[in-house]
Amino acid sequence: MIVGIGTDLVEIARIAALMTKRNEVFAKRILAQQELERFKQHGQPEKFLAKRWAAKEAISKALGTGFTQGVCFTDMIIGHTDQGQPLIELTGKTAEIAQQLGIENWSISISDEAHYAVAFVIAESRS
């Protein structure tokens, strides 16, 4: 059963401008430690960060909380399978809230094209 759906669209230039002002400080606010390592090595860091921003905003919307009740960017880790399929891992208070809602499965799609990054998330329970 679908518990929540979330989507987010972000302009990559907006993220690039924030990075210019605060670069790694801004990235540390958005990325979990594992993601930060990949960010530092990425050839297009503004796209990497924009896609993570969109994904995490979409997750918060699927939870129905936004970034309240202890939900935070760094409790959301966006990884990938060997084939490139994006995966969601939650930790901390964000994971607790997902568990309370009965969420057992996440589906996520992330994409970017020229000026924008977009993410779409579905949160599901068994019943």
UniProtKB/Swiss-Prot annotation:
The keyword Ribosomal protein does not apply. GO terms for cellular component: cytoplasm. Keywords: Cytoplasm, Fatty acid biosynthesis, Fatty acid metabolism, Lipid biosynthesis, Lipid metabolism, Magnesium, Metal-binding, Transferase. It catalyses: apo-[ACP] + CoA = holo-[ACP] + adenosine 3',5'-bisphosphate + H(+). Its cofactor is Mg(2+). Its EC number is 2.7.8.7. It is an enzyme of class 2 (transferase). It is found in: Cytoplasm. InterPro entries: 4-PPantetheinyl_Trfase_dom, 4-PPantetheinyl_Trfase_dom_sf, ACPS, Ppantetheine-prot_Trfase_dom. Mg(2+) binds at residues 8, 57. Transfers the 4'-phosphopantetheine moiety from coenzyme A to a Ser of acyl-carrier-protein. This is Holo-[acyl-carrier-protein] synthase. The gene is acpS.
